[in-house]
């Protein structure tokens, strides 16, 4: 069975020439939405996602605007509103060392270099220069950890374990 990953959500149409407005959920929109690439539309009714080929991509405000081969007007793409854009796992591509997909990080247990368990990563935020990992603690408020070399010492995806150095003021 194919494992699917969300890369965007179709929130509306744009204009009358078949453009769709996408809220992107990928770190690599230029690569993911490149003309000629194939994405898969998964509608709200379920069922197997079906392929569409990208014929144009541009950015408009906070959205990515896409057109698909064979869908040349607004009436043909209206049906896609609310649908998700997905890719199969084999289209994710390799990342450089020290880079991870969100689905690999979320669910990892976090410990200090002394071995003290802090909690589990529940979310990844991208507020600016670096990602911030949100750690759900067993008790108390969530902990925010910046993904920088001074703090994150080791990431072991296979064992779902992240080791951090606690700097002053972090806890």
UniProtKB/Swiss-Prot annotation:
Q: Which Pfam families match?
A: PRC (PF05239), RimM (PF01782)
Q: Which UniProt keyword terms apply here?
A: Chaperone, Cytoplasm, Ribosome biogenesis, rRNA processing
- GO cellular component annotations, sorted alphabetically? cytoplasm; ribosome
The places in or outside the cell where this protein is found are: Cytoplasm
A GO term for molecular function = ribosome binding
- Please list the disulfide bridges: none
Q: What biological-process GO terms show up in the record?
A: ribosomal small subunit biogenesis; rRNA processing
Kindly report the protein's main subcellular placement as a broad class: cytoplasm
The keyword Cytoplasm appears for this protein: yes
What the entry lists under InterPro entries is as follows:
PRC-brl_dom, PRC_barrel-like_sf, RimM, RimM_N, RimM_N_sf, Transl_B-barrel_sf
Where does the record place the PRC barrel domain? 97-170
What does the subunit comment say?
Binds ribosomal protein uS19.
Similarity field: Belongs to the RimM family.
The record's annotation in NCBIfam families points to: 16S_RimM
Q: Which PANTHER family match?
A: RIBOSOME MATURATION FACTOR RIMM (PTHR33692:SF1)
* Notes on the domains: The PRC barrel domain binds ribosomal protein uS19.
Its name, as the record gives it, is: Ribosome maturation factor RimM
């Amino acid at each position: 069975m194919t494992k699917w990953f969300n890369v965007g959500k179709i929130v509306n149409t744009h204009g009358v020439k078949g453009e769709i407005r996408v809220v992107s959920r990928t770190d690599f929109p230029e690569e993911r939405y490149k003309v000629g690439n194939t994405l898969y539309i998964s509608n709200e009714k379920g069922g197997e996602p079906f392929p569409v080929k990208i014929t144009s991509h541009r950015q408009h405000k906070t959205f990515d605007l896409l057109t698909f081969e064979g869908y040349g007007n607004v009436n043909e793409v209206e049906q896609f509103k609310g649908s998700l854009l997905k890719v199969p796992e084999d289209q994710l591509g390799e990342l450089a060392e020290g880079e991870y997909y969100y689905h690999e990080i979320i669910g990892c247990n976090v410990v200090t270099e002394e071995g003290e368990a802090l909690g589990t990563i529940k979310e990844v935020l991208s507020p600016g220069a670096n990602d911030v990992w949100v750690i759900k603690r067993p008790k108390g408020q969530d902990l925010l950890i910046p993904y920088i070399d001074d703090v994150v010492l080791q990431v072991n995806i296979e064992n779902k374990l992240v080791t951090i150095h606690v700097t002053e003021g972090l806890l």
